């Protein structure tokens, strides 16, 4: 496992307390699992993503990730409609381990309120939570 200081936290992203990240891309938001979360899970062997067109409320489960250690649920950091899913994750779930902020993204959503992204944690605030053991 990585030490907290080794965790990658891109400054341009926003983070949820549940260890998901959000990147605004125009009027859409790309969502994935943080480097910290993938590191804690260990080798990821299966990912279940939602259906395109599904509307998922903030805080609701949007994906399930299975690793050699455990099965974990991922919680939607902002309400919106799923407009795309990362299909290659189904065949190659280790992408979540190898590239959590790149090829390992999970869903692309059209947020109900794009301004809600500003309510999520900055990289600095997320790191502070991690150091606090949350």
Q: Where in the sequence are the language-model features?
A:
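Charged, amphipathic alpha-helical coiled-coil/dimerization segments
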Residues: 79, 83-84, 90-97
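Short glycine-rich, polar/acidic loop-and-turn segments at beta strand-coil junctions
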Residues: 35-37, 69, 78
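Small beta-strand-rich domains/subdomains or short beta-sheet motifs embedded
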Residues: 14, 48, 66, 72-76
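Acidic, low-complexity mobile loops and tails
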Residues: 1-61, 94, 98-106, 110-134
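Short histidine
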Residues: 62-64, 71, 91-93
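Residue-level recognition of beta-strand microenvironments
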Residues: 22-24, 68, 85-88
């Amino acid at each position: 496992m990585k030490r907290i200081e080794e965790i990658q936290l891109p400054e341009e992203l926003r983070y949820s307390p549940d260890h998901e990240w959000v990147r605004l891309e125009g009027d859409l938001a790309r969502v994935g699992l943080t480097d910290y979360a993938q590191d804690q899970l260990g080798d990821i062997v299966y990912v279940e993503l939602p259906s395109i067109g599904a509307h998922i409320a903030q805080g609701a489960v949007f994906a399930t990730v299975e690793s050699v250690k455990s099965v974990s649920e991922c919680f939607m950091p902002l309400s919106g409609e799923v407009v795309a899913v990362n299909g290659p994750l189904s065949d190659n779930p280790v992408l979540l381990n190898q590239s959590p902020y790149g090829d390992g993204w999970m869903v692309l959503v059209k947020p109900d309120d794009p301004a809600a992204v500003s309510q999520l944690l900055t990289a600095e605030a997320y790191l502070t939570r991690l150091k606090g053991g949350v």
